[in-house]
Amino acid sequence: MAPSRIPSNRPFFIPPLRSWGLGLILLAPPAAWGDCTTLAQDIQTAARAADLPALAGHARLIPTEPTCPDDYRAKLARVAALGYIREIQQRLTAGEPLAAQEDLLRQSVAIANTWQAQALLGDLALDRKHYEAATLAFQEALNLINDPVDTPKAPPEAEIQSIFRKASECRLLAERYVAVPVNHRSGTAEGLALTAVRGWAVQRVPLPVTFESGSTAFTAKGEQAASDLADYLLKQNPPDITLVGHTDDRGSDQENRVLSKRRAEALAAYLREQGYEGRIRTEGAGESQPIELDDPDRYTEEEIWALNRRVELVRR
């Protein structure tokens, strides 16, 4: 079942103020930290009151306050950044458009990069049909959620699924192929390549492997996506995968099932040529399994057709 849509004007999950930054109130700085204690109190007060001018002034002091340990600076910055998000969500709930909040979003990210800000930036790009930028923002939100240091308290699973779904949709619609980000410390692929996000297991990933019309030949974007998938599989080396081809609802059901199966097989053959030795199952679903969209009203009929013409990677 598809998770319920989480519209951009619905308040994001933001932990209670006492839990922002791993409990800045419950674990206040010791008195020996001097001015850092005062700064923490000032930031919390301004965040509660949504006093953005005061919050901005206090946030500017975080990098240079000598009595604050470095790890505590990051927590303070996150509290200040989420103060902006709190105000933005109040404005959205009051009916203001998301586009009018862009400056505040940028100010929030300049203080600390939070998943809430990146998800809203993704929604903003999606509303403008800037699909490449939206994909990047949503993937960054997923990475931040998956990092317990950046996000001590994970959002509800439905929120994670919604962001993952929007990231997948935007990557399918982007004119150019958008690669998944790679963690430069660990070398592992993240974003839409994550197999789990804070306990939510990713079982199906729509791949932007596109084909020429009525053909099993990759488009330029499709070839890039197939190459990236091969690199990922060679590094991760899963013992088996399933590829499911899908089509839109134009044409006969039988023709679509045959074409979708042939396309899944074409991708499987390419992966074997690139050296992947795991077992590959291929299926052709034709038009029988339309993509479950986060919000169908966002898209034109042509875009929905494009979203349905996909190959899915299924993890068992």
Please tell me what each predicted stretch does.
Residues 58, 103-104, 137, 144:
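Alpha-helical solenoid repeat scaffolds, predominantly canonical TPR units
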Residues 28-30:
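N-terminal signal peptide c-region/cleavage motif recognized by signal peptidases
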Residues 64-85, 110-115, 132-240:
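Periplasmic peptidoglycan-binding/tethering modules of Gram-negative envelope proteins
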Residues 49, 94-95, 128:
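Structural motif corresponding to the intra-repeat A-B loop/turn of tetratricopeptide repeats
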Residues 246-316:
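Periplasmic OmpA-like peptidoglycan-binding domain that tethers envelope proteins to the cell wall
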Residues 55, 100-101, 134:
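Single-residue signature of alpha-solenoid repeat helices
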